[in-house]
């Protein structure tokens, strides 16, 4: 446990240190290619080079270099902005917040107690402090045990059952994080480095200052691809002129050698990461989901259409009805009444091993969910990814042929003829959509 906490602190510290260092590397490369190479060697050669001026080559290299550097810096700054200020964290549950507040209060009481007893004998102070700590820790653990119990019915479920499809556990409830005391939205993952649940988390990357998630994965791909192109250009330029200088003068320039090494290192690194990231986007997967993609089985709660519920229906699969029944009240509590309005019935279905319900069936469509639908969105770090918009009534993320097949096999496909033949259901549908729309705006 202590080792894990130490690793977490190290990772967080490194993620704060590396971005300024990386920006410094870009600054050093800009100096090396501008002054020692283009100015002192090509445009106005120093006397010890004994060469004629090649202003055209120097100007062209500078122009291309800074044209390539601008998108690298722009995407990196946008990436840092999203990682730091819009990381895609899920809010912690009320119980977790109260637990954290209680823990802070315990620490404050302990500090006051220690100051109050500071004049006593050392052995007596130690004895009393230990006893006080034991009481505080015990109360904290007692509260944590209650807070981490899985809630039978809790606020926040509405954001799930107002959708048509959501990822659930075998009992039909959304996945629950006992650390954050919160239901996890589809594809969310708990990151141990930041101790928070993150929407569509891809990985924790110290190079970009934190967690890469649905809010930053697009800009991460743009930065990696632009940096790869930038490094290839720098590598080629310094390789050519380093070889020329060594061949004609029998020596090398230390700045050129350093930039040659850095561009080689970062070039090969970004090439591999770019290929991997584009492949993940083409398959509509995250790095975490890709770890067990060949064996993963997704459990989905899929809404049972009204026209099926209005008939005599004998399901061959498990179902769950929302809102859930009220929890039996404690002695000092009043039981919450179950909402007396519309009920939402969901079928609990599972995919086959290796199937991805979020794969849209086309690499291009999958990439568009990350990069956008126009060429400008692919090139410029301006708009957010379409997958970060969860306003659809169907699901938090776009769904693919796997879900369509599951609906068909379970007999849950919405029939237009059946809906039109059911005036009651047809009359209730707009009201249902309006109710869900109000909830979405409220969120």
UniProtKB/Swiss-Prot annotation:
The chain crosses the membrane at residues 17-37, 57-77, 220-240, 256-276. It catalyses: L-cysteinyl-[protein] + hexadecanoyl-CoA = S-hexadecanoyl-L-cysteinyl-[protein] + CoA. Belongs to the DHHC palmitoyltransferase family. PFA5 subfamily. Residues 96-137, 410-443 are annotated as: Disordered. It comes from Aspergillus fumigatus (strain ATCC MYA-4609 / CBS 101355 / FGSC A1100 / Af293). The keyword DNA-binding does not apply. Keywords: Acyltransferase, Lipoprotein, Membrane, Palmitate, Transferase, Transmembrane, Transmembrane helix. It is a multi-pass membrane protein. The DHHC domain is required for palmitoyltransferase activity. It is found in: Membrane. Residues 107-123 have a biased composition (Basic residues). Residues 124-137 have a biased composition (Basic and acidic residues). This is Palmitoyltransferase pfa5. GO terms for molecular function: protein-cysteine S-palmitoyltransferase activity. The keyword Membrane applies. PROSITE patterns: DHHC (PS50216). It comes from the Eukaryota. InterPro entries: Palmitoyltrfase_DHHC, PFA4/ZDH16/20/ERF2-like. GO terms for cellular component: endoplasmic reticulum; Golgi apparatus; membrane. Its main location: membrane. Autopalmitoylated. Residues 175-225 form the DHHC domain. Its EC number is 2.3.1.225. It is an enzyme of class 2 (transferase).
